[in-house]
Amino acid sequence: ILKDHGNEVLLLIKTKDVLEKLIQQDGFSFVNIQPKTRKNNPVAILLASFIRTWKVVSIVKKHQIDMLIGTDSSIAQAGYLTRKQAITTLEDDYEVIRKLADLTYPYTKTILVPEVCKVGKWNRKKIGYDGYMKLAYLHPNRFTPDVAVKNAYIQSDRYCLIRLAQLTAHHDAGIRGLNNQLVKNLIHVIENKGYQVFISVEGEIAPELSTYQLKINQNDIHHILAFASLLISDSQSMSVEAAMLGVPSLRFSDFSGRISVLEELEQRYRLTYGVKTNDPDRLIGLTSELLENRDIRSLFQQYRKQMLSDKIDVTAFMVWFIEHYPESVNIMKHNPDYQHQFN
């Protein structure tokens, strides 16, 4: 959209999961500022951050960049070092991503986050919007589930997804998720309810679970998710995506109760359930309970409809915010309801 409006856009990425492959399939040109996956220790994290910042500074100078927008600390730091406008877009609370936030928030000009998101002592830089980052690409104005895409992989209408995350981000340290035995127990419960099971993994799958692995073009994952009866996951991201699509989800994670976006989706809109990793029996029980409800899909679509009525078209809002920056900051600070024209 920004390009269609006559703006020049340079996309920067770092190697993560299947990100590079997805962008290539979408036909976007990009620069990878971290081609190799870093090790998951404090020294490696800091060194990789320094190298990314140095690379972004070089790119800003070479291409005469006017504005930087993104989630990575290198965006904020490079903006600070080159005296360019930098907008940080995130949706995790400060206490959850403290290390990333401490490398980012002091240097960025604006922190653009969902209204419910907490940014610690950096509230003066916060611009909150009534939406979620994942609504930017899963709002009905942006995404329409295609049953034909789903049918190319899965013919049944009665299936559940289990998503296994790698949990390698710096804020994932000490966080546990779904183990193989618990996944086997879940499969037993789900199949006994008459549903098929498909497992989506970020890394390698255990050999004994490989027959359940979902093998698809990753660009099609949201079409598969949209028609699922239930998502069970230790991925916070896919749980939010399921909520955007009105698909019930159970997230098994020690992050449960700690992330404001997911707490709002659970407590206010009833679109997801969080279960701590010390209570696997509750996860099994909720799985059985949800799959016994024959009206579960229509019920959660009603919950989704309520959520969407309260939220904005995040993409339309962000395009306006970027193109009118920094005036857009003053507008949002003095009249936050201005955003509700983007729906």
Regions found by a protein language model. Name each.
Residues 87-89, 96-111, 225:
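A conserved, positively charged/aromatic
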Residues 108-177:
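A nucleotide-sugar donor-handling region in carbohydrate enzymes
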